[in-house]
């Protein structure tokens, strides 16, 4: 039976390849994710290992012992006076201090703008270059800085900006931007790329001045004399340093601590694997459908095997072997495709300025094993039901014409099973969303299982819905086909004219030249122009989809040019023929047959549509939820901000120097300038965002919704007093007059008295849970920086006013002024960019479903070869056959859309209800939903191109004899 299975696959190479392709994309996503994250992990591991290679003990500020939003809170600096005391210890061979900051040092590009890093660190270093053993950087050109006006920068920035040793480079820090002489170019150890991150390194005194570390260091590295262990050295150091202000660690302890900062790679891994799982899940539907159709088409073959003695177990083994080989083939291709995908993803991150440190390609044994295992297991599980179905073929079917498989004993109960699964899915989703005491992992598991069961339940129920849905969407499909035909008609006429000019006989030279020239104009100019206009119009429904269509039109133009060249080559070789004149009019017979064909086998149509349904449901879910969040975000900001302008960082999310706010506050046009600083602290036992406000001005530019207090509460805010938001007050049972403690990152604890309680929007509050006065904030926090500055101007916002404010910020290129409306629009753009990334990743699932539709149509054409031959024999033209197959595909796609779009909206409504406490609104983006339906219809048309072409070119006599 192994030989039978392998010969069967060899005889159906195209079907086997298309089936394997359904698993390739999912496996590629899995292997690509592992390869990419392994490259990133190795790079970070190399960075940390090399940074502390010669360090036996490491001294840093006392860790506050808490995290905020998953990130370690930066410890305070240490006194530089510790360094001489450490150097005098008997077991110390060498010690050196370091100044380091990862956010405020911005290298300015040649256009005068700060280099954007997409959220990656912008390091500023002060290094003792006389102790090279502790220097993690490696020169690639020039020398190290020795004077206050000298700097060395990273090789990536130097290459991107064409900076060379001897150039003048401007750098912005906590001080106004100033020029430095570039004396060196360096890289981080042996790591060739640190991603989008940048660094500028100075002398220690210069760094202390630029980064506000007067008399302070961020760390001290110490090496021991030969024979002294790291533990002995740490013990000795602890005897001469203030342990209430510093931490002393061994090299191993410090490397472990540093690696916590790279834990975000796990988030990237799980994020990408989620979409890989979705693609694999959709692929499983495609494989199930393909193998089911294949089994149905091979009834006589299986019956013959049964007749000559094959047992049911042997048939089960044969089909399972086919599934195994297809899965293994798909997994192997997917593994190698994943390596290319990892390189592509890294290039994509770099293109959007968000690349991460990486090393060379790493294909770990774990990656190979998991990729192959997933591909084979998913295919075997998906092929189990068709394999079992094959065992039920009776031997007598070998001599019957048109024999079909008997219905299973459980078939009558499937609708009830489907309804039960849908009910179970709703229960799981409700449990995951509304249960209050669930751990995050359990909640996510319940939601994931709920979605999985819901999709399976709807897929099992959909065969009952197919006949009704087919009748409903058939008229839509008819008009869709007319619209598509009209849009592509100039292209088709151009192709017909061009082929006529090449191949037609009995025409004059002038007619031939006219046909060739006219065909080329229609084919390469007018046709693509009409397609481009249609794609451009799609931008008004969905910008992302519109641009995707525009790219598709460009690709189409390239394909058409290649087709023209190949057609000329074929003509020179004496091959080819003139095609039929393409038609446009409605064809009632074709229209009716296409609808009947989709209803002929509801199970097959439903399984094909289910794959597209899942992809569309997820895209719709994300679009509706994201649009609700975007609207909630916009309204939350509009409720809070009263000022005309916002002063923010150039990249929109970093902090900015307080000096920038002070500079713009002096502008003649500014009536009110209110700085807002931000930090982290442990308030009443829990970690919260702490903001510093200007008591005299904040109420003029920020709208407080007071629950207990008035604007006077903050106007008179003094030291050891705070205003808090209502959510924090309710959680900690606080009210006006209550007292609570605040612990800062320096480890100091202060008592605070509540002077007012206000209600902040739960979605995107601009102030922290606890707010104190600016003077008091500056006392508690090292190097305080502005989160943003609210600006109200005389006479309202205008272009001239903004130009004047920008001139006042000339020394602070890392800050920018935006109107209130422009700043809100920028927040919307961030949502749109993230949504675009999700669309790109979910496109894999849609592509897999497209492969499934192609597969089903190809197999359907094989199965109906005699039927198609009969239709041709009784007068149906090639164009009619082609149109019938295309319309079948569009009907199937519309059924998938009719199921997927409402399902996605339903899931989004559930999640929105669960997020009601955050004021997330339910606002379906109707234009986007229409665009998704159009995409589904176009997917149906594209999926039918090759099958329709094959069906229209069947030889009539051979088709009538086909078995």
Language-model features: locations:
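Short cytosolic juxtamembrane segments of multi-pass membrane proteins
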Residues: 392-407, 952-963
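Interfacial "coupling" helices/loops that link adjacent transmembrane helices in transporter permeases
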Residues: 8, 12, 276, 283-327, ...
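C-terminal transmembrane helical bundles of large multi-pass transporters
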Residues: 598, 605, 609, 675, ...
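Juxtamembrane segments of multi-pass membrane proteins
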Residues: 65-67, 73, 464-467, 471-481, ...
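Alpha-helical transmembrane segments, especially those used as permease/efflux helices
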Residues: 11-18, 236, 242, 267-270, ...
